[in-house]
């Protein structure tokens, strides 16, 4: 797993699986890396082959942690494979997370958001 900071933004990538074996350490490492006042947390799922219920729980816990002390934090999931996208839809978590199919979509959203502020 790779974690990068850019100002108050955090990007997590190179996640091969998010399951019962690694979900707790994933959640704890990302939580520890969160900036004091995060604006956007991006989790790139393009390399992720498998997510189970523990992985979903870790993502939800990160969402709650980011938003419990700071309003307006965006947790964006990037490039999930179709099977993982389907899992988000089946569990209705796609209504909670912002999901972008490409990095280009994320850049467009960021540009649009900055024009509003």
Residues of each region from the PLM?
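STAS-like cytosolic regulatory interaction modules
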Residues: 1-50, 61-117
């Amino acid at each position: 797993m790779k974690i990068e900071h850019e100002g108050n933004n955090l990007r997590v990538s190179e996640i091969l699986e998010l399951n019962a074996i690694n979900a707790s350490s994933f959640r704890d490492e990302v939580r520890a890396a969160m900036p004091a006042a995060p604006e956007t947390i991006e989790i790139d799922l393009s390399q992720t082959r498998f997510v189970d219920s523990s992985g979903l729980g870790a993502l939800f816990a990160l969402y709650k942690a980011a938003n419990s002390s700071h309003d307006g934090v965006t947790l964006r999931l990037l490039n999930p494979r179709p099977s993982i996208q389907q899992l988000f839809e089946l569990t209705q978590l796609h209504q909670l997370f912002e999901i972008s199919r490409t990095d280009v979509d994320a850049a467009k959203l960021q540009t649009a958001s900055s024009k509003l502020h």
